Amino acid sequence: MSARFEGSYLGDATRLADDAVLECKICWQRYDPAEGDPVWQIPPGTPFAALPAHWRCPRCDGDREQFMVVDG
């Protein structure tokens, strides 16, 4: 059983606001939908839940489940 952190994304898009800012719990890289992700060529305005399945943290290559909600 893996450890769960309060606020972790864990793939549950139904509980995530479109403007929610998330942070990687490995390296603290933030994903802000207002900014998108230039490394992965994700345009501004793209909610975290709408990121492609292959998207990973641009800093540490952690998967989406390593992100937790910090605002939203």
Curated annotation (Swiss-Prot):
Swiss-Prot/TrEMBL GO biological process terms: alkane catabolic process
GO molecular function terms attached to this record: electron transfer activity; iron ion binding
Note on how the cofactor is bound: Binds 1 Fe(3+) ion per subunit.
Rubredoxin-like domain segment(s): 19-72
Alphabetical keyword list: Electron transport, Iron, Metal-binding, Transport
Recorded superkingdom: Bacteria
Matching InterPro entries: Rubredoxin-like_dom, Rubredoxin_dom, Rubredoxin_ET, Rubredoxin_Fe_BS
Cofactor(s) listed: Fe(3+)
Chain positions recorded as Fe cation binding sites: 24, 27, 57, 60
Matches recorded under Pfam families: Rubredoxin
Function comment: Rubredoxin is a small nonheme, iron protein lacking acid-labile sulfide. Its single Fe, chelated to 4 Cys, functions as an electron acceptor and may also stabilize the conformation of the molecule. Could be involved in hydrogenase-linked redox processes.
Family: Belongs to the rubredoxin family.
Protein name stated in the entry: Rubredoxin
Organism per entry: Azotobacter vinelandii
